Amino acid sequence: MKLVSSEKDTYVYTNNKTVDRTKPSLVFIHGAGFDHSVWTLFARHFSRHDWNVIALDLPGHGRSEGPVLESIEAMASWTIELIDTLGLNSVALVGHSMGSLITLETASRLGDRVTHAVLIGSISPMPVSDPILDATANKPGAAHSMLTSFGFSKQNLMGGNPNPGMWMVSDSMRRYEDEAQSALDSDMRACNAYQRGLEAASEITAPTLMLHGDADRLTPMRATKPLLDNLSNARMDIIPGAGHSLMVEDPNHVLDQLKIHLL
């Protein structure tokens, strides 16, 4: 589904359905260097269960026109504008990694318009190492390899996939390669710079689910406590053997937890 927001073409995946304002609505927000396609399995499930699903492409990602937004705050403002353009009075928000920071900022501003929040692979602050920032700016191939390597648990890097016929590591590499280099670099710098996450978390009253892999090396488990402590109505679910790429490492567990939290 294409729509115009701020005079730019914006793409949102809706499972080929028109948004029905009488139904509950679920907004999926992707992580750095990715697009709406990471949410296809989950969006289709909730669409079949009478939810509006809006898996967005942030500006400069996927099928949405640029320019790329350079801060989490700007991405949250854009997301709110999109929600308002669609005429949605209330929404549930699901975000992965950078998308979880956008979820925090968006939910803190929308208040009781947010019915539920889900933070997947989330910590705050979310620092990015200098070697990764150097690679995203100057050596995109190396950046893709680094982020893919660290994005999976060590056991999942060895092979195997819950989706038959797919190789999750190669799939991640192809997704990075399909996006503009400038988008990944800008996204990483936005994550590194965002410092309002704990304050935003303290302002959120909606029931919140944190989903985390116990083998996450990009946003390690030991760093989740400050965020969890600042959320007033939250629970944590830990996925054994999973790294940062939870939606492909254990999609069934993620879907089951989304259903428990949202349905």
Regions inferred by a protein language model and the residue ranges of each:
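Catalytic histidine-centered segment of alpha/beta-hydrolase-like enzymes
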Residues: 242-255
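Active-site glycine-rich loops that stabilize anionic/oxyanionic intermediates
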Residues: 31-34, 97
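Conserved alpha/beta-hydrolase catalytic His-Asp/Glu region
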Residues: 134-203
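Catalytic histidine neighborhood in serine/cysteine hydrolases
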Residues: 225-244
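Short beta-strand/loop motif that positions the catalytic acidic residue
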Residues: 204, 210-212, 216
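Short beta-strand element of the alpha/beta-hydrolase
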Residues: 23-31
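Flexible "cap/lid" loop of the alpha/beta hydrolase fold
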Residues: 101-146
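Active-site loop/oxyanion-hole signature of alpha/beta-hydrolase fold enzymes
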Residues: 8, 15, 40-44, 48, ...
